[in-house]
């Protein structure tokens, strides 16, 4: 599935497929499904909860950015040469506009695995 998602004030074409979880593991060394389960817990928090628990969310930042990086490069190969270049291009991860984007990123990442409502 391919979708355009706004992150850090910029629109990116992102793609999720059966390959996404393998690309994620190869790039990060972490389990795609384990990290997705952490993000689905985040999705249920309201924006006030997130603001109050930013310190607790710190590990989640990398998961969101890493998943975005993988799906952007899957949609349009070589959009970024490496994760560091991608990280530098993002001005803000969490703001009122990005909360919907984060939900979209999670839903897109899950789409090759499960197409129901989350």
What are the residue ranges of the model-derived segments?
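Short capping micro-motif at the N-terminus of alpha-helices
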Residues: 14-16
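Short, surface-exposed, low-complexity cationic segments
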Residues: 18-37
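Charged interaction scaffolds used for protein-protein
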Residues: 1-11, 31-54, 62, 76-118
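Short, amphipathic alpha-helical segments that act as regulatory/interfacial helices
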Residues: 65-73
């Amino acid at each position: 599935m391919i979708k355009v998602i706004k992150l850090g004030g910029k629109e990116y074409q992102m793609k999720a497929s059966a390959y996404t979880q393998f690309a994620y593991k190869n790039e990060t060394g972490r389990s795609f499904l384990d990290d997705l389960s952490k993000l689905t817990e985040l999705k249920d928090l309201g924006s006030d909860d997130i603001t109050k628990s930013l310190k607790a969310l710190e590990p989640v930042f990398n998961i969101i950015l890493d998943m975005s990086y993988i799906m952007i490069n899957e949609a349009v190969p070589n959009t970024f040469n490496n994760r560091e270049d991608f990280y530098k291009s993002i001005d803000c991860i969490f703001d009122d506009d990005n909360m919907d984007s984060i939900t979209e990123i999670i839903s897109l990442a899950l789409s090759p695995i499960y197409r129901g409502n989350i």
